[in-house]
């Protein structure tokens, strides 16, 4: 069926509206799970220096995440303006954190990049490279921290210290294998479900790891600041890495409950009080999830309203 066929246009409109409705429903469901009064009270009463420092790091983290899509721009060779790429990346990341990868990482990217004139094959490569970049940094940091034994696990937890070290070594081996293939593989092209992917150079792979690792470290620094710097920074970072993989396994939007459960299990008592942890993580959610999501929603609506004009401008420039 031709894309100009009336049935195709109708189907596209229906799918678009279904997507909008799904996003709205997810936002409403998520909003009902949040104690907004408590969230506002925590932010209002927080130490101003720690809060402003954390806000600055949130901005830095979102800018770094935007570099994932800028790397993908270089990798794919598309010509969208860098500011458009950064804006799409910001919107997608905010929705991804709160409403899951399917909505933010995939759905939003396909919606916005296609509206700006990119073909589906290019968008698939952008998403693939972005998610690879994110997890390469995670794997490198988690491998290093788990192997070094920075995270002290409580007795009778789900895994013991030895298992965590073995996991860390395994993660570092994944990094080594990826770098080896990027540096020495002769067959550098692969096709997955009709999409052609090209293995990047080893220098590009190092850039992926560096940018993503810095982003994960900034995220850890935000929580560390909000905890009042009362716990070793690398311990806090390690706990964040453990909670992140737990959130992926449980697959709850925004990891509601998972983040708190892991932090309380690994930090409460000897290191800091349970109340301090809950307050810090609630402030973290407000600064890193809620406020960016509200801004992303506004940016999304503005981008949708300007999409046709921007697409025409992009197609004229290509």
Whereabouts are the PLM-identified features?
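Internal, well-ordered alpha-helical segments in soluble enzyme and binding-protein domains
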Residues: 109, 119, 128-135, 139, ...
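Re-entrant/interfacial helical elements at transmembrane boundaries that shape
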Residues: 103-115, 144, 253-268, 282
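Predominantly cytoplasmic-facing regulatory/coupling regions of multi-pass membrane proteins
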Residues: 1-90, 147-248, 274, 279-281, ...
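Membrane-embedded alpha-helical segments of transport systems
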Residues: 91, 95-99, 122-143, 246, ...
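Membrane-interface alpha-helices at helix entry/exit sites of multi-pass transporters
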Residues: 83-87, 101, 106, 116-132, ...
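Interfacial segments of multi-pass membrane proteins
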Residues: 112-122, 239, 243, 261-276
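Transmembrane alpha-helix interface/packing and boundary motifs in multi-pass membrane proteins
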Residues: 92-100, 241-260
């Amino acid at each position: 069926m031709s894309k100009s066929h009336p049935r195709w246009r109708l189907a596209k409109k229906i799918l678009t509206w279904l997507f909008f409705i799904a996003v709205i429903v997810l936002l409403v469901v998520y909003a009902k799970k949040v104690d907004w009064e408590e969230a506002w009270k925590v932010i209002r009463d927080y130490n101003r220096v720690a809060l402003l420092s954390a806000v600055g790091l949130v901005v830095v983290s979102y800018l770094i995440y935007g570099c994932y899509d800028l790397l993908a721009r270089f990798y794919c060779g598309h010509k969208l303006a860098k500011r458009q790429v950064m804006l799409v990346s910001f919107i997608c990341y905010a929705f991804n954190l709160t409403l899951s990868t399917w909505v933010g990482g995939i759905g939003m990217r396909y919606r916005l990049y296609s509206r700006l004139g990119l073909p589906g094959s290019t968008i698939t490569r952008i998403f693939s490279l972005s998610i690879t970049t994110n997890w390469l940094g995670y794997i490198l940091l988690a491998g290093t921290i788990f192997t070094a034994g920075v995270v002290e696990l409580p007795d009778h937890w789900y895994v013991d210290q030895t298992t965590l070290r073995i996991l860390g070594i395994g993660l570092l081996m994944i990094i080594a294998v990826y770098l080896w293939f990027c540096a020495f593989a002769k067959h550098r092209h692969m096709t997955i479900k009709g999409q052609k992917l090209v293995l990047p150079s080893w220098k590009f792979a190092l850039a992926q790891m560096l940018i993503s690792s810095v982003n994960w470290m900034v995220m850890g620094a935000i929580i560390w600041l909000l905890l009042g710097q009362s716990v070793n920074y690398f311990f806090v970072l390690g706990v964040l890495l453990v909670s992140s993989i737990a959130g992926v396994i449980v697959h709850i939007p925004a990891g509601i409950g998972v983040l708190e459960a892991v932090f309380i299990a690994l930090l409460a008592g000897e290191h800091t009080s349970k109340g301090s942890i809950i307050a810090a993580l609630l402030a973290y959610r407000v600064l890193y999830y809620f406020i960016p999501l509200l801004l992303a929603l506004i940016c999304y609506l503005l981008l949708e309203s300007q999409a046709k004009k921007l697409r025409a401008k992009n197609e004229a420039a290509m």
